[in-house]
Swiss-Prot record:
Assembly behavior: Homohexamer. Forms an RuvA(8)-RuvB(12)-Holliday junction (HJ) complex. HJ DNA is sandwiched between 2 RuvA tetramers; dsDNA enters through RuvA and exits via RuvB. An RuvB hexamer assembles on each DNA strand where it exits the tetramer. Each RuvB hexamer is contacted by two RuvA subunits (via domain III) on 2 adjacent RuvB subunits; this complex drives branch migration. In the full resolvosome a probable DNA-RuvA(4)-RuvB(12)-RuvC(2) complex forms which resolves the HJ.
Positions of DNA binding: 309, 314
Name this polypeptide is given: Holliday junction branch migration complex subunit RuvB
Alphabetical UniProt keywords: ATP-binding, Cytoplasm, DNA damage, DNA recombination, DNA repair, DNA-binding, Hydrolase, Nucleotide-binding
Binding site for Mg(2+): 65
HAMAP family named among the record's database cross-references: DNA_HJ_migration_RuvB
Chain positions covered by the region annotation Head domain (RuvB-H): 254-338
UniProt subcellular location: Cytoplasm
Record's signal peptide: none
Biological classification of the source: Bacteria, Bacillati, Bacillota, Bacillota incertae sedis, Caldicellulosiruptorales
Residues bound to ATP: 19-20, 61, 64-66, 170, 180, 217
Organism of this sequence: Caldicellulosiruptor bescii (strain ATCC BAA-1888 / DSM 6725 / KCTC 15123 / Z-1320) (Anaerocellum thermophilum)
Annotated EC: 3.6.4.-
Amino acid sequence: MERLLDNKFSIEDVHEESLRPKTLEEYIGQQKVKEKIKIFIEAAKKRKEPLDHVLLYGPPGLGKTTLANIIANEMGVDIKITSGPAIERAGDLVAILTNIGENNILFIDEIHRLNRTIEEVLYPAMEDKKVDIVIGKGPSAKTIRLTLPPFTLIGATTRAGLLSSPLRDRFGIIERLDYYTVEELSQIVMRSASILKCDIEKEACIEIAKRSRGTPRVANRLLRRLRDYAMVKHTGSITYEVAKSGLEMFEVDEYGLDLVDRNILEAIVYKFGGGPVGLSTIAAAISEDEGTIEDIYEPYLIQEGFLVKTARGRVATQKAISHIAKIKFKLKESGDNR
């Protein structure tokens, strides 16, 4: 079953398109990044040049794709969207590059997953606006260098450390997107509820924001699920009490942790004495993929002070130990033996 708090893109998030802001003014949060991007855009427009190449990095669900679309909109240019895994051959990338219009934007999501051979096609394209095409095979093969129109590459990644230095160094603008505050998320929830024509109390927006793991994508997903819950179980309006009872039914606690997060913490606390314990051991203990734990669950647990990464492994903090003990006590009181 799909995880409600998963900050990765899902099929259902296609419906989120209507919730996406279209301008920097509408874009809530990431204030420092916004201010810098606004300056770079205005300067590029005054010079009548394309924006310098941009690398956006940070955890999933924080608005990298949205920001790329906003940049295109603010620059008044078209954007071509693709992803690292979708570009399987160097020829695929060459075809995309040779079809980009002047000053337009190419957005590559998960750019860290580009094959190194394919990545090398980008070097002359980004630096010199040139791309090499090989015609023919064997000894008679010839290389023709084509000139590309000026363009902007926007790359997005959740793992900036996996980018090769030659690629990373070719980006003139590198910005990290951070987790959102509760206040910012509550504004996003209120705005989304208005677009969805969903009646919601301010206190309910704050409650959703508190449990959204600092991530707009999660906040919007919780809002849609609570809209369903309110329509079926209540009058349709999302009050504070409706939000609280709905989130409890979805097993999303006051810290924004779900069953999977708690399984990780419980394994470290009860099976391995609080740690330190290796990632592979945790993964085996809860039957979860190592990469999924490291990329999806751990960043938030570390950010919120539940987990510490050391050279010897993962260690549960006192906050984690207290929280897990409190949950166990509540379950015991309610007769739940989990």
